[in-house]
Amino acid sequence: MASLSMASVNVSFCHPLRSSSPKVSLRSSVHFATSLSSSHSISGLRAVLPLKISTVASPNSQKLHSFTVFAHKGYKMKTHKASAKRFRVTGRGKIVRRRSGKQHLLAKKNNKRKLRLSKMTEVNRSDYDNVIGALPYLKVNRKAT
């Protein structure tokens, strides 16, 4: 599973005659997604932020500047290769598959039936979770009709 670390730093600059140093506030919130297979995690914010934050006060800037730093640590999910050969995605994002029944015993099937079995058909919506689980990088539009 992937883990996500987030830190926000707010820096505000004040007028130099009123205050001698700029104000720096550090607010951090670290979110970890853990799983049973992963024993590694990010230890605090030391991997995200430098040890010392230096700021310079300017006389005409009194705005509050903030930025957010994201660090994404995780592993690639593996594609199930047998499923990758069986399923495709259309231009609209639908998952399609081949029809079964066209491998053998074709002599007793008429041409109309063989032609119908040659075409691709859509995967049922109830099977989308199974297919997407096997093919994590498939570009699927779940809202396509």
From Swiss-Prot:
Residues 1-56 form a transit peptide. Disruption phenotype: Embryonic lethality. Embryo development arrested at the globular stage. Pfam families: Ribosomal_L35p. Coiled coil: none annotated. One of its GO terms (cellular component) is ribonucleoprotein complex. GO terms for biological process: translation. It comes from the Eukaryota. GO terms for molecular function: mRNA binding; structural constituent of ribosome. Keywords: Chloroplast, Plastid, Ribonucleoprotein, Ribosomal protein, Transit peptide. It is found in: Plastid, Chloroplast. Gene3D superfamilies: 4.10.410.60. Part of the 50S ribosomal subunit. Belongs to the bacterial ribosomal protein bL35 family. PANTHER family: 54S RIBOSOMAL PROTEIN BL35M, LARGE RIBOSOMAL SUBUNIT PROTEIN BL35M. This is Large ribosomal subunit protein bL35c. It comes from Arabidopsis thaliana. The lineage of its organism: Eukaryota, Viridiplantae, Streptophyta, Embryophyta, Tracheophyta. The gene is RPL35.
